[in-house]
């Protein structure tokens, strides 16, 4: 059974505090937007889909008990607080897309004279809660599409890697499972689907320095699921791909530009370079809400920079020399030329065909 990172019922929201994992499983109560902003910014909850879900649900929890005198006051509160939530972690596009969608809904409901203020609030709450259910369904579709693509690619290359039992070995980076989404996962959802099909021989996960999401979170999920899994250091990826017959790399995304350039957790770019050298397919698994057609390329993606302390300390223990300068970008951008395919809930697309394909899907 998948881990539950988000617990929600109308008027109540709790998130599994991921800063405490794997040592302690503790749920943090989110009472409203200010709490939502803090748990996102502090990375108590992380992963682009989960950020959007928790951000929107924190607003739902806040407005649920409120009585609004006018539709205008409700619309203003929705717009102002959603824009504030976007600022918590700006690189992940999912929160921005979800905010824009809900603001558009609020404006449409405001203009609809047949709906009163209570009806407007109810419709808004329903739409927010629907995002939670949709994310889980989308994750499952991503998993199915990704597993199919990887197995088909292996078959085209002449079968599973030498020495395997017909199943595949895959590498993933950072954390993209139930802890990063509403449930099931994106890239880890692909791994999960391979396991459900009986086609997962082994999964390797990187430690993902400096925040160690791979070691703390992905390894935690893999052990929980009892998948055959091995943790490797970020610096071992080249040796791993040379020695272990890895069939594919599959990672998540915080933002995908219209040309396929992909911003993901720092370290993703170098894995893609190494995968290209070793002729290992490199897949990005992401929902359509992670694709930003308004951005032509990766150079336009804002990269969040994190505090030096995340590099210089482990807990309260300093591991770097005092006085050393640090550069700590949370993400890097993998060029589309290094990406084999982008796995979405609506199919797997080559980066070159992404913009046209997604535009047609959105129009339909």
From Swiss-Prot:
GO cellular component: a single term: nucleus
Short name of one Pfam family: IF-2B
Quote the subcellular location field of this record.
Cytoplasm; Nucleus
Enzymatic class: isomerase
Keyword ATP-binding in the entry? The reply is: no
Entry keyword set = Amino-acid biosynthesis, Cytoplasm, Isomerase, Methionine biosynthesis, Nucleus
Active site (catalytic residues): 254 (proton donor)
The pathway to which it is assigned is: Amino-acid biosynthesis; L-methionine biosynthesis via salvage pathway; L-methionine from S-methyl-5-thio-alpha-D-ribose 1-phosphate: step 1/6
Tell me which family the UniProt entry assigns to this protein: Belongs to the eIF-2B alpha/beta/delta subunits family. MtnA subfamily.
Q: What name goes with this protein?
A: Methylthioribose-1-phosphate isomerase
Per the UniProt entry, what species is this protein from, by scientific name?
A: Drosophila erecta
* UniProt lineage: Eukaryota, Metazoa, Ecdysozoa, Arthropoda, Hexapoda
């Amino acid at each position: 059974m998948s881990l539950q990172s988000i617990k929600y019922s109308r008027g109540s929201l709790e998130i599994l505090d991921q800063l405490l994992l794997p040592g302690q499983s503790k749920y943090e109560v989110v009472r409203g937007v200010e709490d939502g902003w803090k748990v996102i910014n502090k990375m108590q909850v992380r992963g682009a889909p989960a950020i959007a879900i928790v951000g929107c649900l924190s607003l739902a929890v806040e407005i649920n008990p409120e009585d609004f005198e006018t539709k205008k006051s409700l619309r203003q509160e929705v717009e102002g607080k959603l824009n504030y939530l976007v600022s918590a972690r700006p690189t992940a596009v999912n929160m921005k897309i979800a905010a824009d969608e809900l603001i558009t809904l609020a404006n449409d409901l405001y203009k609809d004279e047949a709906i009163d203020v209570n009806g407007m609030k109810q419709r808004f709450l329903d739409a927010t809660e629907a995002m939670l259910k949709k994310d889980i369904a989308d994750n499952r579709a991503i998993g199915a599409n990704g597993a199919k693509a990887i197995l088909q690619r292996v078959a085209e290359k002449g079968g599973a890697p030498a020495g395997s039992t017909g199943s595949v070995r895959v590498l993933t980076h950072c954390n993209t499972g139930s802890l990063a989404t509403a449930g099931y996962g994106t890239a880890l959802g692909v791994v999960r689907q391979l396991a459900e099909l009986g086609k997962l021989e082994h999964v390797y996960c990187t430690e993902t320095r400096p925040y160690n999401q791979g070691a703390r979170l992905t390894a935690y999920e893999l052990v929980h699921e009892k998948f055959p899994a091995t943790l490797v250091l970020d610096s071992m990826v080249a040796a791993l791909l040379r020695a272990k017959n890895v069939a594919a790399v599959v990672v998540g995304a915080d933002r995908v530009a219209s040309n396929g350039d992909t911003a993901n957790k720092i370290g993703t770019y170098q894995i893609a370079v190494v995968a290209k050298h070793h002729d290992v397919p490199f897949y990005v698994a992401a929902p359509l809400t992670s694709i930003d057609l308004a951005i032509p390329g990766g150079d336009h993606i804002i990269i969040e920079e994190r505090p030096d302390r995340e590099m210089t300390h482990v807990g309260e223990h300093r591991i770097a020399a005092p006085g050393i300068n640090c550069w700590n970008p949370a993400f890097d951008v993998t060029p589309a030329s290094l990406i084999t395919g982008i796995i979405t809930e609506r199919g797997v697309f080559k980066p070159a065909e992404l913009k046209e394909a997604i535009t047609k899907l959105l129009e339909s």
